[in-house]
Regions:
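Short aromatic-glycine motifs in intrinsically disordered, low-complexity regions
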Residues: 21-31, 98-99
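Catalytic strand-loop segment that frames the active site of acyl-thioester-processing enzymes
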Residues: 32-72
Length: 163
């Protein structure tokens, strides 16, 4: 099990922090059409982020997933969990991608999908730091729709230098 071995845990934050839509781009190098975090509701001192993704009928991949019965793809939900975890990692370490670092998806464990997500839905995304070891961060993640579990997963992100 990865254990926390640093005293960096949100040292500069008060009990809650909200990140504006523009500031999301300071913490994530992703851009449209591959930016899947629309809002960061809060990041708290317990090392947890609450973010949101609003699903619109304009999502480019819904045309083919599935014609006449659009369902937001599970792999994109996993990506959104990873992006929320990346924001949390950057905030926790008090740095941004501009400083030459990036969080890349290193693994996904224990994935379960429980409910379909469709255009018009808004999913709430939660990620909590479980630990860090040698630059590999472990997060306990879930996505919810109307307070019902949509997806759960353990996400691993690697903190790497941009080359």
């Amino acid at each position: 099990m990865i254990g926390l071995n640093h005293q960096f845990l949100l040292k500069n934050l008060v009990s809650k922090m909200k990140i504006s839509k523009d500031d999301i781009k300071k913490y994530l190098p992703h851009r449209k059409p591959f930016l899947f975090i629309d809002e960061v509701v809060n990041i708290d001192k317990n090392n947890e982020i609450h973010a949101r993704k609003m699903i619109t009928s304009n999502e480019y991949f819904l045309e083919g997933h599935f014609p006449g019965n659009p369902i937001f793809p599970g792999v994109i939900i996993i990506e959104a969990l990873g992006q929320a975890s990346g924001i949390l990692g950057f905030v926790t370490m008090d740095k941004t991608p501009e400083e030459g670092s990036i969080y890349v998806l290193a693994g996904v464990d224990k994935v379960r999908f429980r409910k379909r997500v469709r255009p018009g839905d808004t999913i709430d995304i939660y990620s909590k730091v479980l630990g860090e070891k040698k630059g590999i961060w472990k997060f306990d993640c879930r996505a919810e729709l109307n307070n019902e579990l949509v997806c759960s997963a353990i996400i691993l992100c690697a903190d790497r230098k941009v080359t």
